[in-house]
Amino acid sequence: DTVCSIAMTLVSVSESILKALEKRFLESGHPSNLTLLHSCGQSDRKDGIQHFAHEGMVTRIIGSHWGLQPRWMDMIAKNQVDAYCLPQGQIAQLYHSMACGLPGKMAKVGLGTFIDPRIEGGKMNERTKRLPDIVDIIKYKDEEYMFYNQIPIDVCIIRGTECDEMGNLTTTEEAMKLEVLPAVMAAKRYGGRVIAQVKRVVQTGSLNPKEVTVPGVFIDDIVVCENPLEEHRQTSSWYFDPSYCGQARVPQENIPAASFNERKFIARRGAMELYHGAVVNLGTGIPNDMVGRVCNEEGISDDIMITVESGIYGGVQAGGIDFGIGQNLYAMIGHHEQMDYYNGAGVDITYMGIGELGEDGSVNSTKMGVRCTGAGGFIDITQNAKKVVFLGTFTAGGAKYKFENRKLEILQEGKIRKMVRQVAQLSFNGPMARKKGQEVMVVTERAVFQLVKDGVELIEIAPGIDLQTQILDKMDFKPIISKNLRVMDERLFVQDGPFGLKLKEK
C-alpha cells in the first residue's frame, strides 16, 4: 500500500496516528512493505514521519526533503529503503493532477538536475539505481518536459483543528494550509481511505462552511487526539500561538532581532540585493532564519513582500525546526497554490542555502557524501526565479570567525571545502541558468561571487581577508577575478542595532 502524509516540519503532523502505526508495527510486524509518499519533510528530528523509519515497515519512500529526519537519512544511506527524491512542488501539484484523473504531471521543473532521468532520476542510493524510473522525459511541440508519473494512493493521513459530526474538517488553528484537499481528492480517485486527526469534534452546523477545508464526505476515519499538548502541537517549539495562524498580531518591536554572527553578516549582505516592491522567497537555513529578521530590524519589511514555499506572505518567519510559518502574516494560501506561482511567474528574488559551488556555477544543496537532505522546494523555486542569491559560509565543518574593528578574522578554517571543481549532485544547473539569463549570486562571509558568461566571478572580498591564502587557496577551481573587485561594505560589521539597509530602486 501507498501511504500519503500531509504536513511540513512538525506543522500539521498527525502525530497520534503515526505513533499508533509505529507501535503496531513494532508489536506485530504490520503494516509492512509500505510506500511512503510525502511532498514536504515532516519531522523535527524526532517525531513526525520518523515513526515510519523502520526497515520492513516502509520499503519505498518518495519525498522531497529529509534534512530534519536523521533516521530516514541513515536508512537511505545504508540502502535499507528504496528512495526517490522529487521536487516538493511537483509532488504537491501531482496530487491535484491525480485528483483530476490525469496519468501524471508535465513540467519543466527538474530538467537538467539530478531529478532528470538522464542524470540520476531522483534515485538517492545504490539500491534504487537498479529500479525503474518514476519520471520520464517527454516532448511536446518540440520542447522537452519532465513527466511525473501518477503514484496511486491507498491511504491519506491529514490533520485539522476540528471536525463536526458529519466529518467536515477545518484547519483554522494550523499554521499552514498545505495541500490537504488535493491529496484527499487524489486518494479518493484511487478508492483510497482518508484518516484525519483533529483536536475535537463539534456539533454539525456549528462550523462556518467557508472555513471547511475538507468536506466530510471525503473523510473515512476521524481520530480525536487524546494528548494534544504532545501530539497536536501547532509546531515543534510550542503548543499554540494565535499569531502564527492569523488570529492575533504582535507588536513588531516584540519580535527579537537576530544575534550578530556570521549567519547574520551573510544575510545582511544578501539583503543588499533587495529593491522596492520585490517579491521574495526564503529557503531553509540562513535565508529563512535570518533574512526576514534582518528586514524587520532594518524597517523595510513592508517595502518588499517576503514569501515562503508553504504559502505564507509577509510577516516575520520562524526558523529552524519551525520552518514555513510566520507571525503577522498578510496572507496564507495553499502550498500547491504557492508552487503554481513559483513554477509559473517565478519570484523576483529567491534566497537559498548552498552546499557546494562548482566551477560552472552549478550548485549542490541536496546531497553531501552519503547524507541526502533532498531537494525540498529548492528546484521548483530556483529554476524559475528571476534572481537567485545563494547564502552560506565559504567552508563547512567547524569554521570560527571574529568580527572586530570592521574586519573579519578567520579563527579556525572549516574542514570541508564548498568551492569544488564539480558538484557531487546537480541541484542547480549553472549553464542552464546562464542560458536562461538568470541573475545568480553566491554570498559568503568572506567573498561574493556572481555567475557570468565565462563562469564564476569574484566581485567582493571582506576587509581583513587575504585574497590568495583565504579565498583562492581554499577553492578547487580558480574563479574569474573582477577588474572592479570591491571590499564589502563596512556597515555590515555593525553589531548592535540596524546597519542602515537602503533598498535599491527596480
Show which residues each predicted segment covers:
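Generic N-terminal amphipathic, Lys/Arg-enriched alpha-helix
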Residues: 1-4, 245-256
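Conserved phosphate- and dinucleotide-binding cores of soluble alpha/beta proteins
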Residues: 9-25, 35-37, 42-52, 57-251, ...
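Glycine-rich N-terminal segment of FAD-binding domains in flavoprotein oxidoreductases
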Residues: 3-24, 40, 280-293, 297
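Short, structurally constrained coil/turn elements
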Residues: 27-30, 77, 300
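Glycine-rich phosphate/ribose-binding loops and adjacent secondary-structure elements
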Residues: 32, 256-259, 264, 268-275, ...
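Non-catalytic interaction surface on structured domains
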Residues: 275, 491, 505-506
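Nucleotide donor/acceptor-binding cores
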Residues: 1, 31-34, 59, 277-278
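Long, compositionally biased
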Residues: 498-506
